[in-house]
């Protein structure tokens, strides 16, 4: 396997698509998606725009759907859920379709939806993702961070580096400078991932919204907490796969 890392969806090439792409948004969309599916959600359907989400959700029975939205780190008024993974408990989400839109992560997923195999990764399901990639033996894999409104994200690149580290990638498998940088970043911070999340600009942004968000950071930094691999089963729809 040969790996390429892109800091944001805006950096993703428009041609030469790989066999597999991994969308990463540690704070917090891909952590939340993994948590929702591990808690028994039927699927998570992602949208870049809130209006599209609201329109599509009307085609789903009210008793079997939940609207989840976040903008600027805050829950969208009138929605059932925000983007805190701690809110996605089995009693709330089991057997429900989650209609989700976030500031960054859902844009990344929509950018990748035409690739044959699309999965999502976070620190909480790192081991499951690594096992999936090992079994797949894809010739080329893109690791795509979500960033923050088009800018670099420390935690997403660290997660990409964690995947490369766990896979034991050789230098020949690192397809661009960003993969080498990601690997170096993770190896520097691997013993203090919560510290990295707290120091990241988005971590600081969440803590500025309320000290209770430190619980989210601790959860998002908890390596291998979940064994689920969210996989795209149709454009924009993720279910438990692998």
Curated annotation (Swiss-Prot):
The superkingdom listed in its UniProt entry is Bacteria
Q: What reaction is this protein's catalytic activity?
A: (2R)-O-phospho-3-sulfolactate + H2O = (2R)-3-sulfolactate + phosphate
> By its UniProt entry, which InterPro entries does this protein fall under?
ComB-like, ComB-like_sf
The answer on whether this UniProt entry bears the keyword Magnesium reads: yes
The family classification in the record reads: Belongs to the ComB family.
The species this protein was found in: Synechococcus sp. (strain JA-2-3B'a(2-13))
Cofactor(s) listed? Mg(2+)
- Which EC number(s) does the record attach to this protein? 3.1.3.71
- UniProt keyword list: Hydrolase, Magnesium
UniProt name for this protein: Probable 2-phosphosulfolactate phosphatase
One Gene Ontology MF term: sulfopyruvate decarboxylase activity
Q: Which gene encodes it?
A: comB
């Amino acid at each position: 396997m040969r790996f390429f890392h892109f800091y944001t969806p805006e950096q993703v090439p428009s041609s030469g698509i790989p066999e597999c792409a991994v969308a990463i948004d540690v704070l917090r969309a891909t952590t939340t998606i993994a948590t929702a599916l591990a808690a028994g959600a039927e699927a998570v359907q992602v949208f870049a725009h809130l209006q599209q989400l609201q329109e599509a959700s009307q085609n789903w029975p009210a008793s079997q759907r939940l609207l989840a939205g976040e903008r600027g780190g805050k829950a969208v008024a009138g929605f059932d859920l925000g983007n805190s993974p701690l809110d996605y408990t089995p009693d709330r989400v089991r057997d429900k379709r989650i209609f989700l839109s976030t500031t960054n992560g859902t844009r990344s997923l929509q950018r990748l939806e035409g690739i044959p195999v699309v999965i999502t990764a976070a620190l909480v399901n790192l081991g499951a993702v690594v096992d999936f990639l090992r079994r797949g033996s894809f010739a080329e894999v893109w690791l795509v961070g979500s960033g923050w409104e088009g800018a670099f994200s420390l935690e997403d690149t660290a997660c990409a580096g964690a995947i490369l580290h766990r896979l034991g990638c050789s230098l020949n498998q690192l397809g661009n400078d960003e993969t080498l940088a990601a690997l170096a970043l993770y190896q520097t911070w691997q013993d203090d991932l919560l510290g990295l999340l707290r120091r990241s600009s988005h971590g600081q942004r969440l803590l500025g919204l309320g000290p209770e968000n430190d619980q989210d950071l601790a959860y998002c930094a908890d390596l291998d907490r979940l064994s689920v691999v969210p996989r795209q089963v149709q454009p924009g729809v993720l279910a438990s796969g692998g």
